Structure formats: structure tokens, C-alpha cells
Amino acid sequence: MKKYFFTLCLLSVVSTLFAQETRTENNGNLILEDIPAIPGSIKEDLSKFQNVRSAAFRGFNNQDEGLFISTRFGNVSQLHLVKSAGAARNQITYFQEPIGSVTMHPTKSSIAFTMDKGGTENAQIYLLNPESSSTQMLTDGTSRNGGPLWSNAGNHIAFQSTKRNGSSNDVWMMPLDNPQKSELILESPDGTWWGAADWSEDDSKVLIQNYISIANSKAYIVDLTTKEKSLILGEKDSSSVNSALAFDENDKGIFFITNQYGEFNQLAYYEIETSEVTVISKEISWDVDGFSISDDSKKAAFVVNENGYS
């Protein structure tokens, strides 16, 4: 009887095992068999970490308290205003495409920014009124444009554009009261990168950066009256890093980053009248990789990459 009962139990277990359904799932890369399904609660908990948004500082609000940030809300990054620490962000732009570079008017609330459509990389420059969120396209709508830089008076924007021939990175100057009357101030002689770095205090000259490669860059000054350009940083027939940063307070010199005087990228100052160079960070044995100067050009801060830490 016991033997009979044991046999029945064994047959019952075997039949139960064979009756169990084999779970198979194909996710496109792996075929999973008899792997337990992932509970929905785990997916929900994971989404809190996968959907964390970052925010990038874009500039201070010149007309009121707060600052502008860009952060993803929906599918693309847009511009927002945060009026105080811990305050709610107020969305300013509502485009289907992400905004690119952003630069604030020196005295007013207007903002110039770049944006392309459909990933074409033919970015256009727009003027934004943050109070009404209204925008105006300033460029032609077809060429590739970038690097908008306000003049100190705020009535012109220097920018890079391919509008002359569709490929060359020329530098132009745009009057805000008539953007269609943009004026070519530097015609690119080659396919390298050219762009405006700073305006002189009286807006009569523009500091121009020419990036050729990671090991070769030069800087020029363009006189806006004569349209003549003068090479001031770097040698015509040799390679070195010369990243133009800004004019000084009295337009007598240029701050720049260079590797000409040591093994590191150093912060230096070039005096225009004498061509004398003073290395500011010569006692720092690390690369200088960031710089910002105050609006009145009286103070500046720079960043050093110290053993991988900024």
C-alpha cells in the first residue's frame, strides 16, 4: 500500500512539472526562458532615477532678480527663469527643437539664441523677449549661423555665418534695428573655424578667434572701420595654442590661453602696443581651461584642470 501511494505521489509530481508552462521572452537581443517577470513596481522605482533632469546656467537676468537656466522639460531642453534660490522655474521657450547657444543683452532683457530644425545643423539666430516669450528670427533661415556676441552698446551682434557661399565660416556684424543689413567683417580664407571672441570697449574693434586644430589656433583684431585684420596671437607658419579670451579694461591688451611658454595651457596677457606677453599662471603646473571676466573688465576668474579636477 505504501509503495502504491509513493508511486501515485511521484506520478503526480512528474505530471505537475510537465504541466507547467515554459515562459519564453524575446527582447530582440536575448531569448529568456523561465526568468521571472520584472514586477511593475521595480520599473516605476527605476524611472525616478532614469528621468532625472540636469540644468545648465545660461546667464543672469539683467532686468530683474534671478537667472536663466536650460533644462529638459518634455523631449528637448528649453530656457527657464529661476527668480531665487529654491524658487520654481518659469519656462520661457516652448519650441519643438532644443535651443543652442544663449547670450544676454548687456543692458536690456533681450536674449539672442541659436536653434536649428530637424537636426540639420543650419542653426539660426533668434531674438527673444523673455517677458512675452515672443521671438524674431534675425538670420536668413537657410545658412548655418552661430556664436552670437552682443556689442557693448547692445545695438549690434557679431556672429559666424556661411551665408556668403554656403560653406565658409565668415564673421558678420548685424545691426539690431535692421538685421537684413548684416555686414561682412571677416571673410574666411579657408575651411577652418572663425568666430568673434570679444568687442573692444568702444565697439570699434572685434577680437577674432581662428581655430585650426587642437594644437593650432590663432587670434586677430579686426578694425570695423577699415575691415583690416591683424594677427596678434600665434605665428602664421607655426602651430601653437592661442585661445583669445577678452580685451582688458582699456583695450590695451588681450587675455588669452596659450602653450607657447611651457608644457601647459597657461593664462597670459598680450600688450598690444609693445607685443609683450606676460604669463599670469606661470606658477601653476596645470592646464587653464576656463576664464570669465566681469562686465567692467576689472576682475576675472579662471579655472584650472588640476589632475583631472577643475
Regions flagged by a language model, labelled:
Residues 4-13:
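Sec-dependent N-terminal signal peptides
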Residues 17-19:
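Boundary at the C-terminal end of the N-terminal hydrophobic targeting segment
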Residues 31-55, 86-89:
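A short helix->beta-strand "capping" segment at the edge of beta-propeller domains
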Residues 51-70, 89, 96-114, 125, ...:
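Conserved beta-propeller blade repeats
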Residues 80, 217-222, 266-270, 310:
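Beta-strand-rich binding/interaction modules
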Residues 83-87, 129-133, 175-179, 223-227, ...:
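Short loop/turn segments that connect beta-strands within beta-propeller blades
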Residues 303-310:
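Short, intrinsically disordered, charge-balanced linker/junction segments flanking boundaries
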